[in-house]
Amino acid sequence: MSTQTVALDIMGGDIGPSETVPAVVQALSLLPQLKLILVGDQHQTTALLQQHGLLTHPRVRFVHASQVVGMGDKPIVALRTLKDSSMRVVLNLVKAGEADACVSAGNTGALMAMAKCVLKSLPGVDRPALIKALPTLSGKRTVMLDLGANVSCDADTLLQFAVMGSVVAEKVEGIASPRVALLNVGEEEIKGNDLVRHSAELLRQCSALNFVGFVEGDRIFSGECDVIVCDGFVGNVALKTAEGVVRMMAQLAGYPRKKRSFLGRLAGFMFKRRFSYLNPDQYNGASLLGLRGIVVKSHGRAERHALCNAILLAAQEAKHQLPLQIADRLESVFSDRDL
């Protein structure tokens, strides 16, 4: 059984070690082949690690980092001045080959800037993209990218995103010949701006893709496609809107019982049971694709169960050697395209 080693920034995020350390315990219990390198300030974490039995755990080692990237730090400042931060160190461990992947719940902008600087892009990748798996009505998951790494893109970049997203759907989600769609304001070929229509032409001409056309925002969770491609501005707005709707529904379901009728309480109970699969914790972890290493960004407010899922995602991507798979596919697609 092959092992996967994941470097974890235990200082990152809004909550920090009080949730990342219990997440480590959970992940180790779920994945016997997992090894973890915990990176953080030893003075702040030693007691907590000892409390959870991790200081002497055979599959855990600790690396001290004297700095922490704050959630409000500017990416360029963090990149230049926080070279011994827990975030930077986990990336260095991946670059050095000591870790197969890394996870951080820290500042998204800083993580993207550091990851691009430390790990560099794969050959043929103009811009890395953030990708995330989403629940669907079919029970399967759809992957969507870009979710905020690039607020503007050209058609060639969206084609690269489509190819990378297809590899993730195949290797990580186990979907054969994944259906690829462009997010648009309508399904008809005449709909959308010049970028979307030009991108559709490129995707349609790419024999390596199973391109099925356009998908509208209200069909993202339908399960009609397996890979949804868009620029980072559109993708981030769509994702944040969906997260807000789920939070609103959850809050409505949890409305104080004494203020609800019997039918209202029954409806709330049924909602929680029927739609538990919508819990964002189950889908925590967005991957920064297109780099020479695996980087998973956990939600900044993620608690232990959600953080555990981000760790497991990183291990799964490492198991499938995702960067190598993406590099091979891109080389195949674009060498054929140049002929």
From Swiss-Prot:
Task: List locations, semicolon-separated.
Answer: Cytoplasm
User: Which biological process annotations from GO are given for this protein?
Assistant: fatty acid biosynthetic process; phospholipid biosynthetic process
Entry keyword annotation includes Transferase? yes
A single Gene Ontology molecular function, please?
Answer: phosphate:acyl-[acyl carrier protein] acyltransferase activity
InterPro entries documented for this protein: FA_synthesis, Phospholipid_synth_PlsX-like
Please identify the protein, giving its name as recorded. Answer: Phosphate acyltransferase
The record's function comment reads:
Catalyzes the reversible formation of acyl-phosphate (acyl-PO(4)) from acyl-[acyl-carrier-protein] (acyl-ACP). This enzyme utilizes acyl-ACP as fatty acyl donor, but not acyl-CoA.
Q: Which UniProt keywords apply?
A: Cytoplasm, Lipid biosynthesis, Lipid metabolism, Phospholipid biosynthesis, Phospholipid metabolism, Transferase
Report the SUPFAM superfamilies cross-referenced here.
Isocitrate/Isopropylmalate dehydrogenase-like
Pfam families in the record: FA_synthesis
Q: What reaction is this protein's catalytic activity?
A: a fatty acyl-[ACP] + phosphate = an acyl phosphate + holo-[ACP]
The family classification in the record reads:
Belongs to the PlsX family.
Report if keyword Lipid biosynthesis is assigned: yes
Task: Please give the GO cellular component terms listed in this UniProt entry.
Answer: cytoplasm
Q: What is its main location?
A: cytoplasm
Pathway per the UniProt entry: Lipid metabolism; phospholipid metabolism
Subunit note: Homodimer. Probably interacts with PlsY.
Its Enzyme Commission number(s) read 2.3.1.274
